[in-house]
Amino acid sequence: MTIPLYLEDSYLKTCSGSVVEIGEDKSIILDKSIFYPTSGGQPGDKGFLQFGSGRCEIVTTRKGENGKIILVPLTNDYLPKLGDTVEQFIDWETRYNHMRVHSALHLLSVVIPLPVTGGSISDIKGRLDFNMPESLSDKEELESHLNELIAGGYKITNSWITDEELAAQPGLVKTMSVKPPIESGRVRL
């Protein structure tokens, strides 16, 4: 299992780690990672690993079995070796934009209080699909309300609740097709 450092500190831009596995496809698995894997419609982080006198570009990150976070290199030309200590660097501009779009979509789900059936995020835009029986009549009012929330400058925080607390408050989950991971005993809000 890879320790997902991004869950505790989304603003961590660099960190060291040790290579614990190199996949047959030359993917890299570290003991701990600041790279967020593709999940829930949000793209995985990209960046690079620095080791010795080398540098390995990471083009995306994905989830693997048993909690592994898989880093996908651009090429197989220059990779760290098993056991190497590497310095991780995420593409901070892209990560930060993903975070901003993600937060904006949470606000949109408040402005449109309907179940979410799908969505996607990029570093420049996002989309939510709603289970909407009919078209919304006043899009300008919705846009104005959303812009008010964004301009409000509210502090964004995260917290953790237990799986049992989430089960007791089903209204916290807006998505119909993607449920939060509940097998770990706690869920990040």
Where do the language-model regions lie?
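Active-/binding-site microenvironments in catalytic and ligand-binding cores
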Residues: M1-L189
